[in-house]
């Protein structure tokens, strides 16, 4: 029977636990070991990995794929480590043994740390404690990586525009048309930026329509020749009803980019893409949808501070209000931010339906609900008695 010697503590600690790393940066830390009794240690090893994984079931078939960004292995040594026979470290209770490590992330594109429904991109350091006649003990610590996306390139600073027209019919009888044209000042944005929307809407059909806009994320997973797409509605804004025979315009209508992860475009098995959808809800017919692609960048360097001022002229928000940190902040997990009722599979159209079931684009005009004025403030003190006492 093998008796297992108890280890008091065995953990990986990074020198900067809150840091978000980029390509080419050094990851440094130490492995800390404490024992409850005299213990012989053969070796302390580390394995650092960065892997993208996708996995889902397609009927009875398992679709699975991995892509590796980082792999680093090393055997660690103590500074002035005491050694016994066979070059083993003799650890004693009451002492803390620290093994330092450090390695550099690869240059070039790296997948941003991400966790989705059918896949993830994870980075971690795993430490192994090898002892004679004992099972190898393991401990693991994750760290965050962001692939820096520069939104100040000419391609991402260029305006994006589109237009679309849809003929509407009722019982196969033509009923006019609905047209939409829209433009945004640039394609690349960062968290906290305001997207300034310029759009024109025309309604010549007999129905009342409603213009809206939404930022939508698309997660694309690829494995074994199969593709899985998950669509998420992140934020939205709407305009006023457009009655028959009238037009409407948006001149700098703002939609803020919330706290979301940067776009992941360089991974061959997992992509995170964003779009600004400008659409018109037409009762009894399909929506008229414009899809303007977006690229969400990481917050670093100049970010989009100077190049997105044109899209901020219609907003009252200042850069002081954004409270930008000096170092990039770890992006949140999508599954923690997005409400469950907005996590829908493709296609996009059901995603754009309102969740509250309200009649915001009725065929007939509805009168607003009548509401009584609220009652006056109640008090148990009689003002007449107070006046008599004063006199």
Curated annotation (Swiss-Prot):
Highest taxon of source: Eukaryota
Stored Gene3D superfamilies: 2.60.40.640
Signal peptide start-end: none
Spans traversing the lipid bilayer: none
UniProt keyword annotation of Transcription regulation present: yes
Principal location: cytoplasm
Post-translational modification: Ubiquitinated; undergoes heterotypic 'Lys-48'-/'Lys-63'-branched polyubiquitination catalyzed by ITCH and UBR5 resulting in proteasomal degradation. Deubiquitinated by USP5, leading to TXNIP stabilization.
Positions of crosslink type Glycyl lysine isopeptide (Lys-Gly) (interchain with G-Cter in ubiquitin): 212
Residues that bear Phosphoserine: 361
BP-aspect Gene Ontology terms: cellular response to oxidised low-density lipoprotein particle stimulus; cellular response to tumor cell; inflammatory response; keratinocyte differentiation; negative regulation of cell division; negative regulation of transcription by RNA polymerase II; platelet-derived growth factor receptor signaling pathway; positive regulation of apoptotic process
Induction line: Down-regulated in response to oxidative stress.
Subcellular location: Cytoplasm; Nucleus
InterPro entries, alphabetized: Arrestin-like_C (IPR014752), Arrestin-like_N (IPR011021), Arrestin_C-like (IPR011022), Arrestin_domain-protein (IPR050357), Ig_E-set (IPR014756)
Function: May act as an oxidative stress mediator by inhibiting thioredoxin activity or by limiting its bioavailability. Interacts with COPS5 and restores COPS5-induced suppression of CDKN1B stability, blocking the COPS5-mediated translocation of CDKN1B from the nucleus to the cytoplasm. Functions as a transcriptional repressor, possibly by acting as a bridge molecule between transcription factors and corepressor complexes, and over-expression will induce G0/G1 cell cycle arrest. Required for the maturation of natural killer cells. Acts as a suppressor of tumor cell growth.
Assembly description: Homodimer; disulfide-linked. Interacts with TXN/thioredoxin through its redox-active site. Interacts with transcriptional repressors ZBTB16, ZBTB32 and HDAC1. Interacts with DDIT4.
Family affiliation: Belongs to the arrestin family.
Identification of the protein by name: Thioredoxin-interacting protein
